[in-house]
């Protein structure tokens, strides 16, 4: 039944409907005049489409205002096709609706045919039967058509700039043609060049009635931008059946389609990747809605006026926008000061509150230019008044702003109160307006319309009335006489009313209730505004409503012209219309503090750029509701790149000006940072705004304007550009420190580092921590800059600069400068204009216009050039083509390839040329002849390298040619967890002949183990090579995620290289893209990398002169040898770990090469580093930090965190090599006790043994076991020495050797059962040593053959444990073991006959730079070909594992010690390798009693802290040579703060123990060791922390103060943890010491007083018996009263040193266990307490309570230092719920409070609270 009716309807429609015309430009219709013709096409009247031809996505809704029914659809003469769950219209137009075109003869693009209405029913009544179509070819790029009623004048927008009566001749050669279809009428606009239809109304009918106009157009592209004002969320329009109402409304933005403040009917569309684009503008101010559907089709539904369309064609999107602005008016040129940061708030409440905001932001050095006040400054919110009570003194405040170079902006609302002033006086503003009849009137035209806004009952100025303009101008002028404001903010001008329509309501008529109401908010025309039948000079409110803000902006501009003659000033408006930007700027209204609103601010910023309002921004941090610190911080970052930059929020919510968050808060710091960048870039922004004013260019720019050839750029709207050259990537997600960012197809440089990014035309994950925003400069552009200041008044006086970002060695830019405020400076030519260009290392600075004389005092003083691949050694400058002059003030940074030229004086108004060279320096050359063979030209050239004898003495004379690289990339495979790259030998490099033949095929594996750690290894995939058999603690499966990684890895193909970049800064920290950056041979491996910084630390086992590495061509060999440490001498340890601190905020990373073969590393100054090793593979681990201490912790996590020593081991240790008997030791012990010198541990060296045989006791020491038992009973501990070498020449049973033979534990010759015999300390039995023999003769005559245990074997560990346990149980007790000579050391070379059996292993083709380099690797150790056995049973050459010998001995020794004693114990090892610190401490070897060794010991301690061996120290007073009194005294002072504090020296030198000098020395020793013992709980807590978490105890200053570059070179001071600084004297005859005082509060340990120094070097008083010690404010140190040893001190009262910081806060921790049990932390058998000071309250919090010996945890004393000047009257403690008063004393003048708790019985395992008043 339904189907039958539908069929009948279709037949009826065929008969009744008439078909209208379609317009399009025909390419073939060209008249001889080159003016395109209009092609007319006749069509046959149609009907509803058949089912097969029914395009659902092309249906145009016939019933847009209500839910359709079939009956209603039939009544409208439309087509019914309901579809469930479909957004397509159920009722759509048939193709016989619309108008019929009246034919004309000889049409062209400028013509005026008539249109006649077809017969179908009207939609909303009052159809207009006859219409007039007017078309105009206005320019080659702009086509206009309008449709009007020829019989009745309809409302047309009285725009102040657009000429509605265009009368010019048709454009010749336009880019478009037009095609018209006659019936039904339609029009098409076609691009000539490609026949693409841009605008096609044939998709739907023209509807034209008195109060309803509809037209649809089909578009060629789905990429549409514009229309407003709404929250579109995305810049590219969502085409999925969206309705956007346009009608100005006081409505805050939200997640909806509400119509907002502005009326903007322009949109733009990009057509294809050629950039061709078009725009459409409807000049109509009536309420409307624009409906967009997916085809895409755009339908306009307008309720008044006319249809007046402008179509713009451009070759690029930017051209289209320029053409639109050419029509509607280009934006105003803002005053320079208005570009500065503005602070504002609604409802400060009082002037005092405003003053406080200004003060705190000035104090925080927040640059800002203008203070804004909202309506709360007014009296009762009345315009042109101010509140004499709450804002008393406002004129004086404004003067203060002006005196500080700042401006004052006031708000003015349009609504004028009709009530008197508060004092009863007349409100003159209202009275004068009444007299001049300037108000909006009711429909009678005579009665002012009364509404209600902020002041209460109000009238509304009619700004379209010329009289009103005069009145408004006069009021602004009068008020300026009273308050010297500088700019005006006009608000509420949509126009807004708090009552609907008026206080009387609105009449029931078709203006207030039209037949069709667009989808506006509330669906009521006069909701929150005035009645639509109200009368204005330009017409009825129905027509002109959306022009209210526009007309007010024009009126305000006129007022400004009077108030500030010839000045630009500043006008900010909320409501806008097309062309408003010519008169005012705009902000995005009353937003919400939410992450969504911050994100959504980017799209309208870009949209208003289209609309001709580029000076645009949002309320930073949000307007309504409380913001959050994180949101506000991120918003300040993005806001710094809004063209208009204002922080504004509503009353009743928290303040959100930057300084409110704290003077040193992260928000303030990042805000200041980016404000400084903002002010630095203001010349660039001003230049962009100049080009917007002159040419109509955009400022904040979407990617598609610049990169239209890349379709990815068409949808990007979470990033934006400033002009062409600056890319901004904000963080828009809560809690995020990474943003998925698209990097357009260009060269990009990190703005802050200058480093070149490798990204291009790709999506990347950009790491942006809490204080960072992504900011990148585009290659090929030059950006003008100026040194920032606190405001533009100051900054405009500062020197100018240029940032030149090169692309293919070229760049361009321009610069505009005027006085920043004159109204017509451009029109009058009073400005300076420059163009810049760079080509081939030459910058031309060309002044094209100079008529601003005052500006010529400014000069370009700094030029920064990014992207210079080679070093610059010369810069020349020339003025006005004169002779060039050498300019010497410049710096080239190789790490980021940038050049900074400073101290220039290139004054404005002149032309200049700046030239620079690019050369390859000696410092960049890679040594081609590192081996020990004679280096000369012949040998060099035979190798295939380049010879340059005139190179610097330090640099290589023989070096690799740049164009060669041994390996090429064959294939690359990427995965989410890493990269695998296969490399093949580059045959083109065959002429380079290195020590052996390269391996032809290599494989690189990169593994992204963690977000802050990665590994890459390079090996031979075809032949198994030796790899270090040490397990690393790394995830079985990588745990990193792409989004969260701190690094990016880039594989370069030619030359092959690995680049690793820190995401947060863009800095490349590993870059092996160097000539011969990789070479891998069987016995020679080389890899080179550029370094990002000259601040490099680490590489152990070699003596360094300072902590920071010297990069001036220094080579450091690493190979374990029994060799006392000395400069460049390879010594006991092998530690291939370094970290680098970068010059960008203290970022640091660590690099660890897991390789145990002999190697050397070479630093060179460019800076770069080359590793050369003679075996194994390359296996690198990188740790990203980001600061030095964190990078170190990450390294320790991989190799194993440091061992936790027993508490007693932190006491003082005494030892000597050369004790003759037990009596000598006993006497020493008694003397130490008698002198009350604290000490815990006594040693004996090998002299306690029989003939230096392990596990024996010599004749003079038979009573040693009893002595040891005695002192252990008195709280002491004993440590014995064990050497690895086991004698094999014994005539009596020697069980250690015999059981070793049985267990097969000794190192052998390869493929035999023969032991490789050596000689060390053990003597032959029954031999008398002849003292007249030389050392070598004595070794041959008296030393026994010894065998070295192979500690890599499992059986050896078992044998070793048996020997240790047997000696402990059978002979004597001990508490710790000292393992020495374990490099391993031998007194013969290789074997007892000084011969080895494999030449190439002991004398490899490349011999690293080792001590005795020519003597072979076997010098004073085993032969390299000897064979050892791994735990898995496989054999390995000593050649590969030599450096693991001491490491392999450490764990078996530690395990045996703990098994034997049942206690934690301590092992001290001389030889080390990475991870040895898990089981052993280390001393720095056999040093000399020289002054320089004291300083070297600090370097060694700090280095071994990096290496994960924190329990370390040097032999106090020196091992070799006689010490002297002053040297030993100073060494005792610094040694008291070694983690491992031991006095030790060699036989046949004078005694140097503390009691061996005199009583004064002994007393000094007591005093300094008492300080140590007092601090042991703090020290022990630090040792626990690194055991649990990794890190350092002995800490370089830069680890705590990494952002302070002054700490980066310090190596004669150190920290204990974060809080305790030691500044010793390390020079002879000195009674003062110069130390660095980092930025913080420091309190003298000896006096408790603030030293009042920060961030500077200072000379401190240091007489002989004083060492300078300081505590860092903000920390709490747990202490304990000292005693003779730790057994007794642990029973004394605890105390706290509370060192307050500047804010009277501090924090600290105490870890406490029994001090000796095994794995107390792992078993939870400990106490962990956190202490906090907050002002005058000290609290403790129990974090873990697993230790029960309360006797050791009694809190007796608290010393509060730096407490403030307030005199304390009372101290109370709350403990176990009880509050008590406590005893105290104070030194008020020193800010010291001493609290005595001994009477209160306080135990730390319960929380406490202590407060004082």
From Swiss-Prot:
**Catalytic residues in the record:** 491, 590, 1380, 1383, 1486
**Subunit annotation:** The resulting sucrase and isomaltase subunits stay associated with one another in a complex by non-covalent linkages.
The cross-references to SUPFAM superfamilies, in alphabetical order and at most eight, read: (Trans)glycosidases (SSF51445), Galactose mutarotase-like (SSF74650), Glycosyl hydrolase domain (SSF51011)
Q: Which UniProt keywords apply?
A: Cell membrane, Disulfide bond, Glycoprotein, Glycosidase, Hydrolase, Membrane, Multifunctional enzyme, Phosphoprotein, Repeat, Signal-anchor, Sulfation, Transmembrane, Transmembrane helix
Q: Cite a single GO BP annotation.
A: carbohydrate metabolic process
**Could you tell me the membrane topology recorded for this protein?**
Single-pass type II membrane protein
Catalytic function, reaction form: Hydrolysis of sucrose and maltose by an alpha-D-glucosidase-type action; Hydrolysis of (1->6)-alpha-D-glucosidic linkages in some oligosaccharides produced from starch and glycogen by alpha-amylase, and in isomaltose
User: Which residues does the record list as Phosphoserine (modified residue)?
Assistant: 7
Q: Name one GO molecular function term.
A: alpha-1,4-glucosidase activity
Gene it is expressed from? SI
Q: This protein is called what?
A: Sucrase-isomaltase, intestinal
Q: Per the record, what ranges lie on the membrane's Cytoplasmic side?
A: 1-12
Q: Which residues carry this modification: Sulfotyrosine?
A: 377, 1294, 1368, 1371
Q: Where on this chain does substrate bind?
A: 250, 374, 574, 648
| Entry PTM | The precursor is proteolytically cleaved when exposed to pancreatic proteases in the intestinal lumen.
- Name the Pfam families on file: Gal_mutarotas_2, Glyco_hydro_31_2nd, Glyco_hydro_31_3rd, Trefoil
Checking PANTHER family in the record gives:
ALPHA-GLUCOSIDASE, P-TYPE DOMAIN-CONTAINING PROTEIN
Any one GO cellular component localisation term in the record: apical plasma membrane
């Amino acid at each position: 039944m339904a189907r039958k009716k539908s069929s009948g309807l279709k037949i009826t429609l065929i008969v009744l409907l008439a078909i209208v015309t379609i317009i399009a430009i025909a390419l073939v219709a060209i008249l001889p005049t080159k003016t395109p013709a209009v092609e007319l096409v006749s069509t046959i009247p149609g009907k509803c489409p058949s089912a097969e031809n029914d395009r659902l996505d092309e249906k145009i809704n016939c019933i847009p205002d209500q839910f359709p029914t079939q009956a209603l659809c039939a009544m409208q003469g439309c087509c019914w096709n309901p579809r469930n769950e479909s957004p397509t219209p159920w009722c759509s137009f048939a193709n016989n609706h619309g108008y019929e075109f009246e034919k004309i003869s000889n049409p062209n693009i400028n013509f005026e045919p008539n249109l006649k209405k077809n017969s179908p029913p009207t939609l909303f009544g009052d159809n207009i039967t006859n219409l007039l179509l007017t078309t105009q070819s206005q320019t080659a790029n702009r086509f206009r058509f309008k449709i009007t009623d020829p019989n009745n004048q309809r409302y047309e927008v009285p725009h102040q700039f657009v000429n509605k009566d265009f009368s010019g001749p048709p454009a010749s050669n336009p880019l478009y043609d037009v095609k018209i279809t006659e019936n039904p009428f339609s029009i098409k606009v076609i691009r000539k060049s490609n026949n693409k239809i841009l605008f096609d109304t044939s998709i739907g009918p023209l509807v034209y009635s008195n109060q309803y106009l509809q037209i649809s157009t089909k578009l060629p592209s789905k990429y549409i931008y514009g229309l407003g004002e709404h929250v579109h969320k995305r810049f590219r329009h969502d085409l999925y059946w969206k309705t956007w109402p346009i009608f100005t409304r006081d409505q805050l933005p939200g997640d909806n389609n509400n119509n907002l403040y502005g009326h903007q009917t322009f949109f733009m569309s990009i057509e294809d990747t050629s950039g061709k684009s078009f725009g459409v503008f409807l000049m109509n101010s009536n309420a409307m809605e624009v409906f967009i559907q997916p085809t895409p089709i755009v339908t306009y539904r307008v309720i008044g006026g006319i249809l007046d369309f402008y179509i713009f064609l451009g070759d690029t999107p930017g051209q289209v926008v320029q053409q639109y602005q050419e029509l509607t008016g280009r934006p105003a040129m803002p005053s320079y000061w208005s570009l500065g940061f503005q602070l504002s708030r609604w409802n400060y409440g009082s002037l005092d509150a405003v003053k406080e905001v200004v003060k705190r932001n000035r104090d925080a050095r927040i640059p800002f230019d203008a203070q804004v006040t909202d309506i709360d400054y007014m009296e009762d919110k009345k315009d042109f008044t101010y509140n004499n009570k709450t804002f008393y003194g406002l004129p004086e405040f404004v003067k203060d702003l002006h005196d500080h170079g700042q401006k004052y902006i006031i708000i003015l609302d349009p609504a004028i109160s009709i009530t008197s002033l508060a004092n009863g006086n007349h409100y003159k503003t209202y009275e004068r307006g009444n007299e001049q009849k300037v108000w909006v009137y009711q429909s009678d035209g005579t009665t002012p319309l009364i509404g209600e806004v902020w002041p209460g009952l109000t009238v509304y100025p009619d700004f379209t009335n010329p009289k009103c303009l005069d009145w408004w101008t006069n009021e602004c002028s009068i008020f300026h006489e009273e308050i010297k404001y500088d700019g005006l903010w006009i608000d509420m001008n949509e126009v807004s009313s708090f009552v609907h329509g008026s206080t009387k309501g609105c009449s029931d008529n078709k203006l207030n209730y039209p037949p069709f109401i667009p989808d506006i908010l509330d669906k009521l025309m006069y909701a929150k505004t005035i009645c639509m039948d109200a009368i204005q000079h330009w017409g009825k409110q129905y027509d002109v409503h959306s022009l209210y803000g526009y007309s007010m902006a024009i009126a305000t501009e006129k007022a400004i012209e009077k108030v500030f003659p010839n000045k630009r000033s500043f006008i900010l408006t909320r409501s806008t219309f097309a062309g408003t930007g010519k008169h005012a700027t705009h902000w995005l209204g009353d937003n919400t503090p939410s992450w969504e609103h911050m994100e959504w601010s980017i799209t309208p910023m870009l949209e208003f750029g289209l609309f001709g309002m580029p000076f645009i921004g949002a309320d930073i941090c949000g307007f309504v509701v409380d913001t959050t610190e994180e949101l506000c911080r991120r918003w300040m970052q993005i806001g710094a790149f809004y063209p208009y930059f204002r922080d504004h929020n509503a009353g009743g919510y928290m303040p959100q000006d930057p300084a409110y968050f704290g003077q040193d808060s992260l928000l303030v710091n990042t805000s200041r940072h980016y404000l400084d960048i903002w002010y630095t870039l203001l010349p660039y922004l001003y230049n962009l705004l100049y080009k917007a004013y002159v040419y109509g260019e955009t400022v904040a720019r979407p990617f598609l304007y610049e990169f239209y050839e890349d379709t990815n750029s068409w949808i990007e709207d979470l990033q934006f550009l400033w002009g062409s050259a600056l890319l901004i990537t904000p963080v828009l997600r809560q809690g995020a420190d990474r943003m998925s960012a698209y990097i357009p197809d260009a060269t990009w440089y990190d703005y802050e580092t200058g480093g070149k990014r490798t990204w291009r035309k790709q999506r990347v994950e950009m790491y942006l921590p809490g204080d960072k925003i992504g900011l990148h400069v585009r290659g090929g552009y030059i950006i003008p800059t100026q040194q920032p200041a606190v405001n533009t008044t100051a900054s405009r006086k500062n020197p100018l600069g240029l940032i030149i970002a090169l692309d293919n060695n070229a760049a361009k830019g321009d610069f505009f400068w005027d006085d920043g405020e004159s109204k017509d400076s451009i029109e009058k030519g009073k400005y300076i204009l420059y163009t810049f260009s760079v080509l081939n290392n030459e910058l031309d600075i060309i002044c094209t216009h100079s008529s601003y004389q005052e500006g010529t005092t400014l000069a370009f003083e700094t030029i920064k050039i990014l992207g210079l691949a080679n070093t610059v050694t010369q810069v020349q400058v020339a003025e006005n083509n004169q002779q060039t002059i050498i300019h010497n003030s410049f710096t080239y940074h190789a790490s980021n390839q940038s050049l900074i030229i400073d101290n220039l004086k290139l004054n404005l108004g002149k032309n200049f040329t700046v030239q620079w060279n690019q050369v390859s320096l000696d410092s960049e050359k890679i040594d081609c002849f590192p081996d020990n063979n004679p280096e000369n030209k012949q040998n060099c050239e035979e190798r295939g390298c380049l010879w340059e004898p005139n190179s610097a003495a330090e640099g290589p004379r023989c070096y690799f040619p740049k164009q060669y690289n041994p390996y090429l990339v064959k294939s690359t495979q990427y995965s989410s967890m890493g990269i695998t790259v296969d490399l093949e030998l580059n045959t083109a490099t065959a002429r380079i002949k290195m020590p052996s033949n390269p391996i032809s095929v290599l494989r690189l594996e990169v593994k992204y183990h963690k977000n802050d750690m990665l590994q890459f290894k390079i090996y031979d995939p075809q032949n198994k090579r030796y790899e270090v058999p040490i397990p690393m603690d790394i995830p079985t499966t990588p745990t990193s995620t792409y989004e969260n990684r701190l690094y990016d890895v880039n594989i370069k193909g030619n030359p092959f290289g690995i680049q690793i970049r820190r995401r947060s800064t863009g800095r490349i920290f590993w870059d092996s893209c160097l000539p011969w950056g990789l070479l891998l041979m069987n016995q020679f491996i080389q890899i080179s990398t550029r370094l990002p910084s000259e601040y490099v630390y680490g590489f152990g086992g070699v003596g360094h002169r300072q902590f920071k590495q010297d990069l001036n061509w220094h080579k450091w060999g690493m190979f374990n040898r029994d060799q006392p440490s000395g400069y460049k001498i390879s010594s006991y340890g092998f530690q291939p770990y370094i970290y680098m601190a970068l010059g960008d905020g203290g970022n640091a990373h660590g690099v660890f090469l897991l390789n145990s073969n002999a190697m050397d590393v070479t630093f060179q100054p460019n800076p770069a580093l080359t590793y050369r090793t003679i075996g194994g593979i390359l296996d690198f681990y990188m740790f990203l930090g980001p600061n030095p201490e964190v990078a170190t912790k990450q390294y320790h996590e991989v190799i194993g965190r440091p061992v936790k020593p027993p508490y007693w081991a932190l006491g003082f240790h005494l030892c000597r090599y050369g004790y003759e008997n037990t009596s000598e030791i006993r006497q020493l012990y008694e003397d130490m006790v008698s002198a009350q010198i604290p000490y815990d541990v006594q040693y004996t060296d090998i002299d306690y043994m029989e003939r230096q045989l392990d596990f024996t006791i010599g004749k003079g020491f038979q009573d040693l076991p009893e002595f040891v038992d005695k002192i252990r009973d008195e709280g002491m501990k004993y440590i014995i020495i064990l050497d690895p070498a086991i004698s094999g020449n014994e005539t009596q049973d020697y069980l250690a050797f015999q059981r070793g033979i049985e267990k097969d534990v000794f190192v052998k010759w390869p493929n035999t059962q023969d032991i490789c015999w050596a000689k060390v300390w053990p003597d032959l039995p029954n031999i008398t040593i002849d003292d007249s023999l030389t050392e070598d003769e004595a070794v041959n005559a008296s030393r026994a053959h010894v065998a070295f245990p192979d500690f890599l074997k499992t059986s050896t560990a078992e044998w070793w444990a048996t020997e240790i346990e047997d000696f402990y149980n059978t002979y004597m007790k001990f508490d710790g073991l000292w393992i020495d000579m374990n490099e391993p050391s031998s007194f013969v070379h290789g074997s007892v006959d000084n011969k080895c059996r494999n030449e190439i292993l002991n004398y490899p083709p490349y011999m690293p730079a080792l001590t005795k380099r020519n003597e072979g690797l076997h010098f004073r150790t085993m032969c390299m070909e000897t064979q050892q056995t791994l735990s898995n049973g496989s054999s390995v050459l000593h050649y590969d594992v030599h450096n693991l010998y001491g490491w392999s001995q450490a764990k078996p020794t530690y395990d045996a010690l703990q098994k034997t004693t049942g206690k934690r114990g301590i092992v001290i090892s001389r030889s080390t390798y990475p991870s040895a610190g898990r089981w052993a401490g280390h001393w720095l070897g056999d040093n000399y009693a020289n002054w320089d060794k004291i300083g070297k010991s600090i370097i060694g301690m700090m280095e071994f802290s990096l290496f994960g061996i924190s329990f370390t120290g040097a032999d106090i007073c020196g091992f070799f040579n006689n010490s002297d009194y002053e040297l030993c005294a100073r060494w005792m002072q610094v040694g008291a703060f070694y983690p491992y504090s031991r006095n030790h020296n060699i036989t046949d030198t004078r005694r140097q123990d503390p009691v061996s000098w005199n009583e004064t020395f002994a007393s000094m020793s007591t005093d300094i060791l008492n300080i140590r013992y007092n601090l042991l709980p703090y020290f022990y807590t630090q040792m626990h922390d690194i055991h649990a978490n990794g890190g350092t105890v002995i800490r370089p200053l830069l680890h705590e103060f990494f952002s302070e570059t002054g700490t980066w070179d310090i190596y004669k001071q150190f920290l204990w943890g974060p809080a305790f600084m030691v500044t010793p004297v390390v020079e002879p005859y000195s009674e003062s010491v110069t130390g660095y005082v980092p930025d913080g509060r420091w309190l003298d340990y000896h006096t408790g007083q603030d030293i009042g120094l920060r961030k500077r070097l200072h000379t401190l008083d240091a007489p002989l018996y004083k060492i300078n010690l300081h505590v860092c404010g903000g920390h709490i140190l747990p202490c304990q009263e000292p005693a003779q040893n730790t057994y007794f001190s642990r029973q004394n009262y605890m105390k706290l040193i509370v060192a307050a910081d500047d804010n009277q806060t501090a924090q600290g921790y105490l870890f406490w266990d029994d001090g000796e049990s095994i794995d107390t932390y792992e078993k939870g058998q400990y106490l962990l307490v956190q202490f906090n000071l907050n002002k005058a309250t000290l609290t403790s919090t129990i974090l873990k309570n697993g230790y029960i010996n309360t006797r050791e945890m009694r809190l007796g004393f608290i010393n509060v230092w730096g407490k403030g000047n307030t005199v304390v009257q009372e101290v109370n403690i709350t403990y176990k719920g009880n509050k008590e008063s406590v005893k105290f004393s104070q030194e008020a003048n020193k800010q010291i409070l001493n609290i005595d708790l001994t009477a209160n019985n306080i135990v730390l395992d319960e929380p406490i609270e202590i407060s004082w008043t």
